[in-house]
Regions:
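Blade/loop signatures of beta-propeller domains
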Residues: 1-35
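Beta-propeller blade signature
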Residues: 121-122, 170-182, 224, 299-307, ...
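Short coil/turn segments at the loop-to-beta-strand junctions that recur within blades
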Residues: 39-40, 81-89, 131-139, 191-196, ...
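Structural signature of eukaryotic scaffold interfaces centered on beta-propeller domains
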Residues: 47-51, 95-102, 143-152, 201-214, ...
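Blade-level signature of beta-propeller repeat domains, shared across WD40, Kelch, NHL, RCC1
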Residues: 338-392
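Conserved blade-ending motifs and adjacent loop-strand segments that build the rim/top face
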Residues: 239-258, 262, 307-337, 351
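Asp-box/WD-like beta-propeller blade repeats and closely related beta-sheet repeat scaffolds
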Residues: 110-171, 188-194
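Blade-loop segments of beta-propeller domains
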Residues: 37-42, 46, 66, 75-103, ...
Length: 392
């Protein structure tokens, strides 16, 4: 199917013109710091994926092959790890996980087995089910739909070939929507397999973004559009990015056979060319996103849909809104109800900031009690979440 583009909005930006050193108080009503409890059972280092539910933060550290569960005030209460005493619940590897708020379940595909594993929000093993299809990324909607991203290699290898025998027209779709009976409902964004070679395309860490509005936002590499899929699986094209020529891929980059088997080398030779727009979250009149190119810069940007102002998030100036502390480090991990974005900082980053502020005698006195408690610990504590509450 072709996504509906009737209400698509154009975002025309020049990354080099992004405003620097915008005061935090001009963008955020407040910034709340949530230290994630550090005890022996809860220690982790990387946030590779995070989902926010009404009850908890769900955090995956891929290096530990573990999902950690924290309450909304940062208290650790359980984790999902493959040493479960229930033999049936033993998995080999956590792939991407999804949450079902309605059923209060966490599930993930194990790339090294034939199963999808299900756990409760309390971290209790529930069941495992045979995988229906493999994907580079996937998303679950509370209406029962599962949405899969299939990589170019998976399409070219014709993985899950038998699955498509009843519906061959969607076999080259990058995006598949399956209903609760595991039948294909829709296929979107087909790949022209005649112009793409194996290992021809870079991937990205995440495709689907939960904006908590009953729909899921998504973007795929080599495509400057942002899409949404609604509760019944219909896709719409909501935004289209227009970049300067020096930052853009050729218009025929995915169609022209001259680029076949040469796309990686093209990007290595044209390092300013953006090949993906990731981490797209919307908060009322502001959207945040990251431009990905071969330079591998932390190019987090904030765009005002009303004024068209472009702001570098990494350069936002700390002030009284955030206790003069940094707010963003690696990326934006989530958004909640159009009201705030969520990022995270390492403990060492916050201790470095404290060292720079030590001459300000009144600074520490103004900190909330939970941050004062955090600073009584050391730099080896768990990361600290930052909730960036947007100005109305």
């Amino acid at each position: 199917m072709i996504p509906d583009s009737l209400n698509r909005k154009e975002i025309r930006i020049d990354p080099s013109s992004a405003t620097l050193e915008t005061p935090a108080a001009e963008l955020f009503d407040s910034v709340v710091y949530v230290p994630l409890q550090t005890i022996k059972q809860s220690i982790f280092s990387n946030i590779d994926q995070m989902e926010v539910t009404r009850k908890c933060y769900v955090i995956l550290d891929e290096s530990l092959n573990t999902i950690f569960l924290f309450t909304k005030d940062g208290k650790f209460y359980n984790k999902i790890v493959n040493t479960d005493k229930v033999a049936e619940g033993t998995f080999k590897k956590i792939g991407k996980f999804v949450v079902d708020e309605k059923r209060e379940e966490i599930s993930f595909l194990d790339p090294h087995s034939f199963y999808r594993f299900y756990y409760s929000f309390e971290g209790k093993y529930l069941r495992k089910m045979p995988k229906v299809i493999s994907g580079e990324d996937f998303y679950h909607m509370s209406t029962g739909l599962d949405i899969y991203l299939r990589s170019a290699n998976q399409i070219l290898y014709r993985s899950n070939k038998a699955f498509f025998e009843s519906n061959p027209t969607v076999a080259t779709s990058n995006i598949l929507v399956l209903d609760s009976l595991k039948k294909i409902r829709y296929g979107y964004l087909p790949l022209d397999t005649s112009t793409v070679a194996l290992d021809d395309l870079y991937g990205v860490a995440q495709t689907f973004y939960n904006n908590h509005n009953g729909r899921v936002t998504l973007s795929i590499p080599y495509n400057y559009n942002i899409y949404e899929i609604d509760s019944i699986g219909k896709m719409s094209n909501t935004y289209c990015f227009v970049l300067p020529a020096m930052n853009s891929l050729p218009n025929d980059f995915m169609k022209n056979p001259v680029y076949k088997a040469n796309r990686v080398s093209y990007l290595n030779n044209n390092k300013n060319a953006v090949y993906s727009i990731t981490d797209f979250y919307q908060g009322d009149k502001l959207v945040t996103f990251r431009l990905v190119n071969a330079l591998d810069l932390h190019n987090f940007l904030l765009y005002n849909l009303e004024t068209a102002e472009l702001i570098s998030m990494i350069e936002i100036m700390p002030d009284h809104a955030c206790f003069k502390l940094p707010m963003v480090q690696r990326r934006i991990y989530a958004a909640a109800n159009n009201h705030f974005f969520i990022s995270a900082l390492s403990a060492s980053t916050l201790f470095s900031a404290k060292e720079k502020l030590r001459k300000d005698k009144n600074w520490e006195k103004q900190l909330p009690q939970h941050l004062k408690k955090f600073y009584k610990g050391d730099q080896l504590q768990n990361p600290v979440l930052t909730l960036l509450y947007l100005k109305k």
